[in-house]
Every structure is written in structure tokens, then in C-alpha cells.
Amino acid sequence: MDHATRAHFTMTVGEVDPLLADALASERGRQQNQIELIASENIVSRAVLDALGHEITNKTLEGYPGNRFHGGGQFVDIAEQAAIDRAKQLFNCGYANVQPHSGTQANLAVFFLLLKPGEKVLSLDLAAGGHLSHGMKANLSGRWFDATNYNVNPQNEVIDLDEMERLAEEIRPKLLITGGSAYPRELDFERMSRIAKKVGAYFLVDMAHIAGLVAGGVHPSPFPHADIVTCTTTKTLRGPRGGLILTNNEEWYKKLQAAVFPGVQGSLHSNVLAAKAICLGEAMLDDFKVYARQVVANAKVLANTLAERGVRIVSGGTDTHIVLLDLASKGLLGKQAETLLAKANITSNKNPIPGDSPRPPEWVGMRLGSSAATTRGLKEAEFRVLGTVIADLIDAEVAGKADDVVEGAKAKIAELTNTFPVYGQ
């Protein structure tokens, strides 16, 4: 073996690329030393990490198990079939496609399957918690399809099902979508399904954020009400970055295979497929049900603690992992609060809330989530501490005295991160 070949197989990141080695080491330290409260994030298991970094990543394949366009795929077939079987069992459905590289690509494949360009879609407004891939103009789905948005009731900030029904009858959409990226309340799949059937629409549930809660039995399942379901394997499902498409319709499933490949994707990501199979297997364990219950319990404690300190909680609380704050109640913008919390080693994100400005710099909302910190082992007592720390920081910022409390807040966060380390650090 010559020197170049030996170096290719043996040199570490630090030897090959010091810049990236330093960035990776810093990111590892950031994850250990900060409390992650971004609702779309979680912390994968060591087993999932091992799969993502496995040599299986070298294998290029197109097609599906038993029907590939390349040889040498027998072991990837095992991984993909395991992921398919586990997804079907976990979500109690007849068919599963586990190849989508993301939730957005899963949604695009469903659009590709069910709709023709220009056909009508009815989905949740972005500021009310919807998602870009549900027909928003900034997304490809909004350029190809004619989307109308339903909203939340301005009094209770819960999805206005009467408005949904009225709009559905008015525009007669081909596809009704529910789900999104910042909606904290339980979804009434049964009523929505009736609305879709009433107007002859297909009913798509995007459960990207709540898939783990559905798997853990703390949120109702979209089946048997949904015609088709998409989700990510990240977020509450606690797996790698990727998507799933689920259905009970055999005829659709056969067409769906082609909608994913070659419709919107080429070769699959072999390492991610293996990691998906692992995370789906983990989600079938009793421990995961305990985890899902704790995620919701922790989010409720966080919401209640902040509400007791005068922070307005959008919709008055949460049924999921998401807690939405209306910082206009404190005279702050979302970006201000995001920057403030970062100084204390709490990671969060600004977010629009119902009725918010369309311009991100003017958003008065903040989205928090309990999934990642719950994975670290934090329970109600620790989330009460987090809520108190966040409220202290907000009140100090309003009073112009944030610098006086940041160091104390950082010390409390350091105590939590040291008590609840990640990956045995």
C-alpha cells in the first residue's frame, strides 16, 4: 500500500483538516455546555451516531430492497427492510417508504403523487404554526400549487376548525394538510378527516414534530383518519435527519415508490437508512414511552413556570413538546430574547406567532421545546429551574439590567449540563 492510499484510510480529521477538526470539537463542547431548547432539535443515541459514521455510507444504491439498480446491496436491504417493518409496526400502518432525505422531500413526493401543478391545497398559516413545504410562496410547493391557509381562532389560538371547513367548502382543495413546525396543541385528526371527505380532498398529516409523541402514545395517531402521513425521523422521534411517508393505501404506495425514486430523489443515503432503522427500533421500547410522557410533562412545567412570571404563552399552554412565547407581553422581540438566552448558554429560536409580522426581524415570538433536554435526563424540577432562569433573564432585560444576571444564569445552566452530560462527557 502506497503512502497516499494508507493516508486515505488512516488519517484523522485533525490530521487532514485542522479547521474542521477544531469546528467539530467546538460543536461537541457546545452541545455539552449548552441546554438545547430549540423544538426541532434532539440528541441521537450512541447507536444512531455509530450507524451514521459506519462504512455502509460508501454504498451507492437506487431502487428498493430486492429491486436495486446496483449490486452489492444485500446488507443495505436488511437495514431498509428493518426500517420499513418497524415504521409500519410503530405507527400501525400498512405501508412505509423510508427513503426521503428530509421531511420537505417527503412532502414534495406526496404532492408529486397526488396533485397536478396548479391544483389547490389548504394548509395551516405559517405564523399560526404551519410549514414552508405546505404551499408557502417561498417554497417550491407554493410555486407549483395554489395554496390557501386556514388559521387559528384569535381568541384561544387553537386551529379554527370551523374556518377550515368553511374554506374547504369555498375553495374545494385537492389536498388538505395539517401539522407544522410551531403548533403546540393536540390535533383533531378525526374532525379534519371529515372535513376533507366532505369536499372530496385527500388528507395529509405532516407529523414531523409529533412523530415521537405519537409513537410514545402521548398524542393521538393520525391513522386511521389520514390518507397519507409524512414525518421526519429527527425531533421527537430522536433519530437521524431524514423523512418517512406512511399510508394504508396499497395503490398509492406502489405509485409512491416511484414518486420518491426516481420522482424527487436519486440514490439513497445508506448510513441514514441504517440509523433510521435503529431509531425506529428504539422508539418501540417501553423506555421510549416513558421518555415521550416526560417530554410533554416537562414542556407543561416550562410553560407554567414562565406564565407565572408574566410571560404570555401562546394558546395558554401546550399539549406537546413545544412552548410558544409572546414576548410582546414583555416589550421584547424574539431575536432579542434569543440572543439574551444564548449568553446564558440556552439555545432557542425566534419564531412567528399568530398575527405576527411577516418580517423575521420584527417577530415577537419565541419557540422553545423540551425534547433534547429531556433526552439528557432533565425532569420537572430541572425544567422549573430553566423556566425561572429564562424569566429572570427576560425581566432583567426589560429593566435594562441583563448584564447583572447573565453570569448567575450561566452558573445555573452549567450546574445542569454538568449533572446531565451527553455521550458520557
Curated annotation (Swiss-Prot):
Entry-linked Pfam families: SHMT
Cofactor dependency: pyridoxal 5'-phosphate
GO-annotated cellular components: cytosol
Top-level EC class as recorded in UniProt: transferase
UniProt keyword annotation of Transferase present: yes
Tagged with keyword Cell inner membrane: no
Catalytic activity of the protein: (6R)-5,10-methylene-5,6,7,8-tetrahydrofolate + D-alanine + H2O = 2-methylserine + (6S)-5,6,7,8-tetrahydrofolate
Domain of life according to the entry: Bacteria
Family: Belongs to the SHMT family.
Assembly and interaction partners: Homodimer.
Protein name in UniProt: 2-methylserine hydroxymethyltransferase
Organism the protein comes from: Ensifer sp
Protein encoded by which gene: mshmt
